[in-house]
From Swiss-Prot:
Disulfide bonds join C34-C62, C41-C66, C49-C61, C55-C70, C81-C109, C88-C113, C96-C108, C102-C117. Residues 27-73, 74-121 form the WAP domain. It comes from the Eukaryota. This is WAP four-disulfide core domain protein 5. Residues 1-24 form the signal peptide. One of its GO terms (molecular function) is serine-type endopeptidase inhibitor activity. Putative acid-stable proteinase inhibitor.
């Protein structure tokens, strides 16, 4: 009975270590996404982190102002944003900044003239 318990525990640990890969996340990568980065580039600032595991609790290692830093993560809805093949002729105008700004299943996606709420691409 003891050997069976040890084998079961070993199998559970092996499967558990593969869960991030199965669900599309790297080991140490936290749930959620990075907030939109609309700030100007600060090229002389060194990265404050390289991966999520270096950030406290609910923060993720994200690009902000062209360098990586620990920032509060945002929720991300399922699906991917559709490709936009247009070029913008007017000033950039963001109608949203994160998925939670959009109703229902819509995602906050980059478009030719800024970000707006769109239905996820089918695929």
């Amino acid at each position: 009975m003891r050997i069976q318990s040890l084998l079961l525990l070993g199998a559970l640990l092996a499967v558990g270590s593969q869960l991030p890969a199965v669900f599309g996340r790297k080991k140490g990568e936290k749930w959620g996404g990075c907030p939109a980065d609309d700030g100007p580039c600060l090229l002389s600032v060194p990265d404050q982190c390289v991966e999520d595991s270096q950030c406290p609790l609910t923060r993720k290692c994200c690009y902000r102002a062209c360098f990586r830093q620990c920032v509060p993560r945002v929720s991300v809805k399922p699906g991917s944003c559709p490709q936009d093949q247009l070029r913008c002729l007017s000033p950039v105008n963001h109608q949203c900044h994160k998925d939670s700004d959009c109703s229902g299943k819509k995602r906050c996606c980059h478009s030719a003239c800024g970000r707006d709420c769109r239905d996820p691409a089918r695929g």
